[in-house]
Amino acid sequence: NDYHPDHRYTGVLVQDAAFMVGVPNVAPDVEPLRKNPVFLYFQDNFKKPNPFQPDIAVDITPVIDKKLAGLDAHQSQFYEWLPWIGNYEEEVPKDPAKHKAYLLQKRVSKPNPEVQKSLEKWYGSARAAKVLYAEAFEICEYGSQPTEAEIRALFPMLKGN
């Protein structure tokens, strides 16, 4: 699910590739994989055709400044065309020094109840209660279905929690 056609179509291409990576002779010069990789969806707020399910949630509070720097690097997307499409251009600060605070308010949300539940699964209730910002992922049904141990290996920040 996504608002941008390029993102939706890329998602379909990845789903198609998720199956084909293990099929011999699709790309004769490349060995097919013996085990399908794990494919993940990034969190969205769309409900149709399928609502997002936060199978994995990661506390990004310690690195929120890096996330904001990454978003801030996409000037035209976050300060021009998304505000234009959403008809909130006047909310975008003219002063670039205020851009990251604007992004934090407009583009980074607190964990919703479903994400909070996933945080509790991966971090425990006490630690999850302290999370200010999180990113969540859904396991794609077209790839390998990882065990909890495999998820913790893929997301080392979840180890020991």
Regions found by a protein language model. Name each.
Residues 19-23, 45, 76:
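Alpha-helix capping at helix-to-loop junctions
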Residues 27-28, 35, 49-50, 56-161:
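C-terminal accessory domains and tails appended to enzymatic cores
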Residues 23, 33-37, 41-42:
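Active-site cores that bind ATP or allylic diphosphates and position pyrophosphate for catalysis
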Residues 12-16, 37-40, 65-69:
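Internal, well-ordered alpha-helical scaffold/interface segments
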Residues 43-45, 51-52:
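A long, hydrophobic alpha-helical segment
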